[in-house]
Amino acid sequence: SITELCKTLSAGPLDPNTEVVVGCPAPYLSLARSLLPETIGVAAQNCYKVAKGAFTGEISPAMLKDLGLGWVILGHSERRAIFGETDELIAEKVAHALGEGLKVIACIGETLQEREAGQTEAVCFRQTKAIAAQVKDWSNVVIAYEPVWAIGTGKTATPEQAQEVHAALRKWFTENVSADVSNAIRIQYGGSVTAANCRELAGKPD
């Protein structure tokens, strides 16, 4: 449960050099924030691209800040696939969330079909390019590489596969944004990460 997870994280020990953020469903955001120390962040799993208006059911970055949150996850593959969110919409959401003072975990990643067709880099670059068109300051952005075929399927990208994409993304940032951003930006891997494989994944340079 979220309560148990929060208690485990609160008890630690955690690496003081590693930023820990818990992303949970909207109804439990206040609960998580109340159970965790300030040193651990809480992220919503989605928000909308405008501050206010008639968007019944949507949550704005301002509302998330009212709950004491500092983070939001945007562009998750399920939002793209199930709810039809486009690269452009996700980029607009990222820009608005950043403008409102939130930190953003922006998700990218290819499907199994795209990987088997040799399109992994093309898809990841396309998704990242849309975000880059809207972002001027990258200091509050984390890129999450989440191959769709490895999310909740039990299949995991090998550490080598993950590293290959992360390295390609850094090269893309160097060529299309700046070397400084490429060196500084955090790129994390998500997709069936377990206690058994996390050490090997974390050991990769990118």
Curated annotation (Swiss-Prot):
Protein name: Triosephosphate isomerase
Assembly mode: Homodimer.
Principal EC category: isomerase
Pfam hit, one: TIM
One cellular-component annotation, GO: cytosol
Biological processes annotated in GO: gluconeogenesis; glyceraldehyde-3-phosphate biosynthetic process; glycerol catabolic process; glycolytic process
Keywords: Gluconeogenesis, Glycolysis, Isomerase
Gene name, Swiss-Prot/TrEMBL: Tpi
EC number from the UniProt entry: 5.3.1.1
Family matches, as Gene3D superfamilies: Aldolase class I
Catalytic reaction list: D-glyceraldehyde 3-phosphate = dihydroxyacetone phosphate
Cysteine disulfide links: none
Family statement drawn from the similarity comment of this UniProt entry: Belongs to the triosephosphate isomerase family.
Organism: Anopheles merus
Pathway(s) annotated for this protein in UniProt: Carbohydrate biosynthesis; gluconeogenesis; Carbohydrate degradation; glycolysis; D-glyceraldehyde 3-phosphate from glycerone phosphate: step 1/1
Molecular function via GO: triose-phosphate isomerase activity
InterPro entries assigned to the protein according to its UniProt record, in alphabetical order: Aldolase_TIM (IPR013785), TIM_sf (IPR035990), TrioseP_Isoase_bac/euk (IPR022896), Triosephosphate_isomerase (IPR000652), Triosephosphate_isomerase_AS (IPR020861)
Active site location: H76 (electrophile), E146 (proton acceptor)
Spans traversing the lipid bilayer: none
